[in-house]
Amino acid sequence: MTALRLIVGLGNPGPEHAQTRHNAGFRFVDALIERSGARWALDSKLFGETAKVEVAGQPVWLLKPATFMNLSGKSITAALRFWKIEPEHLLVAHDELDLAPGTARLKFDGGHGGQNGLRDTIRLLGHGKFHRLRVGIGHPGHKDRVVPWVLGRAGREDDAAIGAAVDAAIDVLPLAMEGNFNEAMKRLHTEKK
């Protein structure tokens, strides 16, 4: 299996978006930064904030696109080119409407599932052959309420559940860093009792 070299968190920049459901990907990479003690640095040529951290003794780049969600692919493809990283070494963390808060799932390849940051990334790469971390934010129940839902803040209970899902994903990240995605998926996808 392929080890990770770049982890991207998807979200929208700016304080008005900081705590929204749509920024679950930012929340994941911010938690990695917090645990590592590293700091974000703005990199205009990569259209985002970057940091280099170690996970399980291995170096990995982190990226938070400073573009809005719909243009995330611009930042991601610039980083892949600049650091000469193939997409199969990429993990993109993003919010997932189709998973309940408190749920996180790893997957490789596939479509965008309506997630605009993934849509733009797949469009610019020409394929979806990269790893994803899907962080559940739940669904509002009707498609007409999706936009205000993702751009809104989660209630206390859902917010705590999203935080727990982020923590669970970080706990299995060392396995993914080593390229052992099957074991990472097995552990992350197994319900805790």
UniProtKB/Swiss-Prot annotation:
It is an enzyme of class 3 (hydrolase). It is found in: Cytoplasm. The keyword Transit peptide does not apply. It comes from the Bacteria. Its EC number is 3.1.1.29. GO terms for molecular function: peptidyl-tRNA hydrolase activity; tRNA binding. GO terms for biological process: protein quality control for misfolded or incompletely synthesized proteins; rescue of stalled ribosome. PANTHER family: PEPTIDYL-TRNA HYDROLASE. Hydrolyzes ribosome-free peptidyl-tRNAs (with 1 or more amino acids incorporated), which drop off the ribosome during protein synthesis, or as a result of ribosome stalling. Catalyzes the release of premature peptidyl moieties from peptidyl-tRNA molecules trapped in stalled 50S ribosomal subunits, and thus maintains levels of free tRNAs and 50S ribosomes. This is Peptidyl-tRNA hydrolase. It comes from Xanthomonas axonopodis pv. citri (strain 306). The gene is pth.
